[in-house]
């Protein structure tokens, strides 16, 4: 049986970049460029579904069109966060779920993520230019 993560009522974060605080502090230009590249990849996948499915099929050795379409619909349409902003509430819920399951998490949610680099893309006009004038919703409604 297959489930959509968002149908399970469990917190999850999608479309994010993970790095350490040293890289954020010492190489912010590299991080900013990588986040811009991630934004371009999100755009490319949405606007070029056949190319995206061909790439996924090649990497995962999937040839069945129905499986590729299903994966594309789930990840490129339903789950992808087009704005790439990490939702603070989702981080807090994820940490709380981990704590309830017995994981020791000492840090506060706000200390675990940084939306500065994504916010810079919006402030600079990068996202608006990339998406041809209209910055998309975080996720498409099913």
Language model features: what each stretch is:
Residues 1-6:
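Ligand-binding "clamshell"
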Residues 10:
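Phosphate-binding core of ATP-grasp and ATP-grasp-like enzymes
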Residues 13-30:
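A bilobed periplasmic-binding-protein/Venus flytrap-type ligand-binding module shared by bacterial periplasmic
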Residues 26-107:
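Secondary-structure end/capping motifs
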Residues 99-142:
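Conserved C-terminal helix/tail region of periplasmic/extracytoplasmic solute-binding proteins
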């Amino acid at each position: 049986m297959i489930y959509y993560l968002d149908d399970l009522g469990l917190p999850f974060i999608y479309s994010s970049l993970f790095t350490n605080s040293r890289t954020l502090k010492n190489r912010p230009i590299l991080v900013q460029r990588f986040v811009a590249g991630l934004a371009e990849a999100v755009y490319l996948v949405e606007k070029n579904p056949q190319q995206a499915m061909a790439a996924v099929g090649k990497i995962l050795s999937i040839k069945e069109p129905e499986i590729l379409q299903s994966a594309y619909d789930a990840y490129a349409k339903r789950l992808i966060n087009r704005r790439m902003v990490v939702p603070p509430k989702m981080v807090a819920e994820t940490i709380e779920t981990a704590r309830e399951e017995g994981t020791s998490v000492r840090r506060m949610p706000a200390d675990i993520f940084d939306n500065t680099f994504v916010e810079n893309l919006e402030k600079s006009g990068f996202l608006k230019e990339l998406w041809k004038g209209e910055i998309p919703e975080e996720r498409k409604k099913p």
